Amino acid sequence: MNKLVIAILFFVLTLGVYAQKKDFYGSNFTVKYPANFTAEGSMPSANNDDTFVSAIFTSPDKKVSFYIYSPNTPALPTDITIKEGFGVPLASSGKKKSKNKVYATSFYEPKDGFTHSYLITCDENDRVTKVVGRRYKTIKDLNASDKLYDEFKKSFQNRKIRK
């Protein structure tokens, strides 16, 4: 009986931790990430204001990381590797009149042993305005993180309007 109560309590507490979110405030964006992940600013803002234009959020077991990049001015990130010639637009994003394009790139098992996958959003002049992605060890890790990753992507909010 005690083992059952302990197991149920552990499940409920674990579920609560996974459901909780924290906010990360970047230079010009906010994103919600799982409370049990570790957040680390990656690429400093050029504004010299102790903020970041990109961040990495790593799971407690270090098998999955989420990535977000939202530059102050459109440009490629320099803190990750983006495969050159990243491809054909996947879909239009935003309002019907928007000319933003979403591109995809991914590369498998570089030297670090993770699979990396990124969605790159570009403006009408093909300048990068946002990159969101993740890296993972195995397909099992990928599948286990799907819901959290979808919530992470949907939580992105741009706080400044780019010129």
Give the positions of each predicted feature:
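Secretory pathway targeting signatures of secreted, lumenal, and periplasmic proteins
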Residues: Y25-S27, K32-L76, Y108-P110
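Sec-dependent N-terminal signal peptides
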Residues: L4-L15, A19
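Residue-level marker for the onset of beta-strands and adjacent loop->beta junctions
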Residues: Q20, S27, V53, A91, ...
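Signature of long, low-cysteine stretches enriched in small and polar/charged residues
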Residues: T78-T129, Y136-I139
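Surface-exposed amphipathic alpha-helical segments
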Residues: Q20, F37-T38, K130-K163
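Short, hydrophobic/aromatic-rich segments at coil-to-beta transitions
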Residues: A19-K22, T51-S54, K97-F107
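A short, polar/proline- and glycine-enriched secondary-structure boundary/capping micro-motif
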Residues: S42-P44, L76-T81, K140-A144
